[in-house]
């Protein structure tokens, strides 16, 4: 189901049983000063059974498709930047920001207001604490809990 106030650009491919809530903007051109508002041939691909609640923005790719996996839960006011690759079973809590070109592993859980710098990679099974800031230089490994600004390893994630 797509809420009537959501804006879904023609370059968006939705999987089965996807929910998109009020005020979402999915598939808009990337916001980058070098190529502001220029449409591309790249898409936003959203996997099956993904829930995207209100006021979420997901930008189209500039060099590849922006991909959201299956069974993801994206809460209010999240931003996913251009060319991001988000694996299956990822949770993005309110106000999380995923920069352009980021790669997010399976089952990662982002706390409220967490920020992931462009081109950063977050391995599978990680928990990113509320307000944490992940840079492209943050040393990360699978199933870790990372907190702080800049983020650091706190402990193993006990799923």
Regions found by a protein language model. Give the residues of each.
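Glycine-rich hexapeptide-repeat left-handed beta-helix
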Residues: 1, 7-9, 13, 19-46, ...
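Short metal-binding segments enriched for Cys and/or His
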Residues: 81
């Amino acid at each position: 189901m797509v809420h009537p106030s959501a804006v879904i650009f023609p370059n968006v491919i939705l999987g089965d049983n996807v929910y998109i809530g009020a005020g979402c903007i999915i598939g808009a051109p990337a916001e980058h000063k070098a190529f502001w508002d220029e449409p591309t041939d790249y898409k936003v691909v959203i996997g099956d059974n993904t829930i995207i609640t209100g006021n979420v923005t997901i930008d189209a790719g500039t060099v590849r498709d922006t991909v959201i996996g299956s069974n993801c839960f994206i809460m209010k006011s999240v931003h996913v930047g251009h060319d991001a690759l988000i694996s299956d079973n990822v949770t993005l809590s309110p106000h999380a920001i995923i920069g352009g070109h980021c790669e997010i592993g399976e089952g990662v859980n982002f706390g409220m207001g967490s920020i992931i710098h462009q081109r950063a990679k977050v391995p599978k099974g990680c928990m990113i604490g509320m307000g944490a800031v992940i840079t492209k230089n943050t040393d990360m490994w699978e199933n870790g809990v990372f907190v702080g600004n800049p983020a650091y390893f706190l402990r193993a994630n006990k799923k």
